[in-house]
Curated annotation (Swiss-Prot):
InterPro entries: CPI-17 (IPR008025), CPI-17_sf (IPR036658). Keywords: Cytoplasm, Phosphoprotein, Protein phosphatase inhibitor. One of its GO terms (molecular function) is protein phosphatase inhibitor activity. This is Protein phosphatase 1 regulatory subunit 14A. Residues 35-120 are annotated as: Inhibitory. The keyword tRNA-binding does not apply. It comes from the Eukaryota. One of its GO terms (biological process) is cellular response to xenobiotic stimulus.
């Protein structure tokens, strides 16, 4: 009998309206968690990278004004940072800007200077479709399974 009373008392406390609310008074009964963002990378480095990306976008829009269809889809900062020398970076950038009718020398030199202050982001390598020797240039990677 005492066990029944104890059980009823515990059950009534669990079902009481004050217990139905979680900590912080949320009616859902779920604990309210403090949102905490952890960043693996240094915030300053990320801001520098973002600033360079915005600068690149602005310069490309200016260089390709009126000929946006010729503008490169992307100037991959990490790909440029992976190259061993500044000469290789320069050639890569000039290759991306082949279709540009406006002079690009100043842009290339400024971009090289900005790249000197950046570091490659660690992460998982994302191979491009051109890195896969089993695919010919005309094959669509999404619709073709490797042999």
């Amino acid at each position: 009998m005492a066990a029944q009373r104890l059980g009823k008392r515990v059950l009534s406390k669990l079902q009481s309206p004050s217990r139905a609310r979680g900590p912080g008074g949320s009616p859902s009964g779920l604990q309210k968690r403090h949102a905490r963002v952890t960043v693996k990378y240094d915030r300053r480095e990320l801001q520098r990278r973002l600033d360079v990306e915005k600068w690149i976008d602005g310069c490309l829009e200016e260089l390709y004004r009126g000929r946006e269809s010729d503008m490169p889809d992307e100037v991959n900062i990490d790909e440029l940072l992976e190259l061993d020398s500044e000469e290789e970076r320069c050639r890569k950038i000039q290759g991306l800007l082949e279709a540009c009718a406006n002079p690009t020398e100043d842009f290339v030199q400024e971009l090289l200077a900005k790249l000197r202050g950046l570091h490659k982001q660690p992460g998982f390598p994302q191979p491009s479709p051109s890195d896969d020797p089993s695919l010919s240039p005309r094959q669509d990677r999404a619709h073709t399974a490797p042999p």
